[in-house]
Amino acid sequence: MQKIDKTLEEWRAMLDPEQYQVCRLKGTERPFTGKYNSEKRAGTYHCICCDLPLFDSNTKFDSGCGWPSFYAPIEDSAMIETRDTSHGMIRTEVTCAQCDAHLGHVFPDGPPPTGLRYCINSVCLDFKPRDGA
């Protein structure tokens, strides 16, 4: 995987303001407002910044948290996990391994088979439906 390295100014020029705030400045969209929170079609979720495939719809589940939730990425190598102690909490941040976009966080309270919940901001994703979906 080839790493993508752009300046913040380059990212700002290619992303809309909300995408830039969340993906590049580690913001968070408000719960239950993201366009993919209730998405049910079959397909693949890609990084909005670099188009790397991140999640398959087969691993998406309704966690009730207000953000799209998945129990596993397509490939473990697509994500980088980092300890996040911001906002007085201890969490694990997940970023895109190809472009370092902030995606969300992973928590150990998901369903089988992994027991993980990848809580991802919709604004960081680009959904590509499977043919016929």
From Swiss-Prot:
Cofactor note: Binds 1 zinc ion per subunit. The zinc ion is important for the structural integrity of the protein.
Entry keywords, A to Z: Metal-binding, Oxidoreductase, Zinc
Domain MsrB stretches: 8-130
Catalytic activity: L-methionyl-[protein] + [thioredoxin]-disulfide + H2O = L-methionyl-(R)-S-oxide-[protein] + [thioredoxin]-dithiol
Named cofactor requirement(s): Zn(2+)
Stored InterPro entries: Met_Sox_Rdtase_MsrB, Met_Sox_Rdtase_MsrB_dom, Mss4-like_sf
EC class (word): oxidoreductase
Family: Belongs to the MsrB Met sulfoxide reductase family.
NCBIfam families given in the database record: peptide-methionine (R)-S-oxide reductase MsrB
Protein name: Peptide methionine sulfoxide reductase MsrB
This protein's encoding gene: msrB
